[in-house]
Amino acid sequence: MAPLIPGELLAEPGELELNANREVTTLTVANSGDRPVQVGSHFHFQEANAALIFDRDAARGQRLDIPAGTAIRFEPGDNRDVNLIPFSGARRVVGFNGNINGPLDA
């Protein structure tokens, strides 16, 4: 067996499906601004930058369906579809732009 390396992660062989069996909402998003906008994987999408035009009511309680720690960048004039999945766990949204600051299901 090879020596352990601090911080090293050893993964089992094979594939892992992220967010399996989660309900997916697809929204069309347009960047109406003059600057790029980047949204991270766990940002409450409803509260994303105001230059992004999309159905904010449909995005309530949802985040991007992308790997943790990654983001999607919307260039000025971009118009694309994104997949969103619901927050899970306690379903509390605190911070971001301060629009919710509490439970989503209250």
Curated annotation (Swiss-Prot):
Catalytic class of the enzyme: hydrolase
EC number(s) stated in the UniProt entry for this protein: 3.5.1.5
Pfam families: Urease_beta
Family recorded in the similarity comment: Belongs to the urease beta subunit family.
Taxonomic lineage of the native organism: Bacteria, Bacillati, Cyanobacteriota, Cyanophyceae, Synechococcales
UniProt KW Flavoprotein keyword: no
Protein name: Urease subunit beta
NCBIfam families: PRK13203.1, urease_beta
Superkingdom of origin organism: Bacteria
Keyword Hydrolase: yes
A cellular component annotation (GO) from this entry: urease complex
Involved pathway(s): Nitrogen metabolism; urea degradation; CO(2) and NH(3) from urea (urease route): step 1/1
Disulfide bonds: none
Keywords for this protein: Cytoplasm, Hydrolase
SUPFAM superfamilies assigned: Urease, beta-subunit
SUBUNIT field: Heterotrimer of UreA (gamma), UreB (beta) and UreC (alpha) subunits. Three heterotrimers associate to form the active enzyme.
GO molecular function: urease activity
Subcellular location: Cytoplasm
Catalysis: reaction(s): urea + 2 H2O + H(+) = hydrogencarbonate + 2 NH4(+)
Gene3D superfamilies linked to this entry: Urease, beta subunit
Biological process annotations from GO: urea catabolic process
